[in-house]
Each structure stands twice: as C-alpha cells, then as structure tokens.
Amino acid sequence: FGIVEGLMTTVHSITATQKVPTPDVSVVDLTVRLVSWYDNEWGYSSR
C-alpha cells in the first residue's frame, strides 16, 4: 500500500505460482489518471 500523488495505490507482485502457463497470454498494465475540478464561480461573483 502507498500514497502516490494523493491517490492510494496497492502493489501486487507476481510470484512463480501466479505466472500464466501459456506464452500467448500476456498481462497488460493500464494506467488511469483521474483529474477532477470544481468551480463554484466564487471569484467571479465576488468582483
């Protein structure tokens, strides 16, 4: 477990018993980044 850029992540290592037995199957690593932003227009309304 760890904190990376404010997100909680879980890291799993692949052991010898978890390896895929057939060479035609591969593991794909996908990285997803979620960016959210909220603007309540407080700066515009308080001008």
Swiss-Prot record:
Residues marked Activates thiol group during catalysis (site): H12
Catalytic activity: D-glyceraldehyde 3-phosphate + phosphate + NAD(+) = (2R)-3-phospho-glyceroyl phosphate + NADH + H(+)
Gene Ontology MF, one: glyceraldehyde-3-phosphate dehydrogenase (NAD+) (phosphorylating) activity
Keyword NAD attributed: yes
GO biological process, one term: glycolytic process
Keyword Zinc carried by entry: no
SUPFAM superfamilies: Glyceraldehyde-3-phosphate dehydrogenase-like, C-terminal domain
EC number, as in UniProt: 1.2.1.12
Organism superkingdom: Eukaryota
Assigned GO CC terms: cytosol
Cell compartment(s), UniProt: Cytoplasm
Pathway involvement of the protein, from the record: Carbohydrate degradation; glycolysis; pyruvate from D-glyceraldehyde 3-phosphate: step 1/5
Keywords per UniProt: Cytoplasm, Glycolysis, NAD, Oxidoreductase
Additional free-text comment from the UniProt record: Plants contain three forms of GAPDH: a cytosolic form which participates in glycolysis and two chloroplast forms which participates in photosynthesis. These three forms are encoded by distinct genes.
Subunit: Homotetramer.
Entry's family note: Belongs to the glyceraldehyde-3-phosphate dehydrogenase family.
PANTHER family: GLYCERALDEHYDE 3-PHOSPHATE DEHYDROGENASE (PTHR10836), GLYCERALDEHYDE-3-PHOSPHATE DEHYDROGENASE GAPC1, CYTOSOLIC-RELATED (PTHR10836:SF112)
Protein name: Glyceraldehyde-3-phosphate dehydrogenase, cytosolic
Source organism per UniProt: Pseudotsuga menziesii
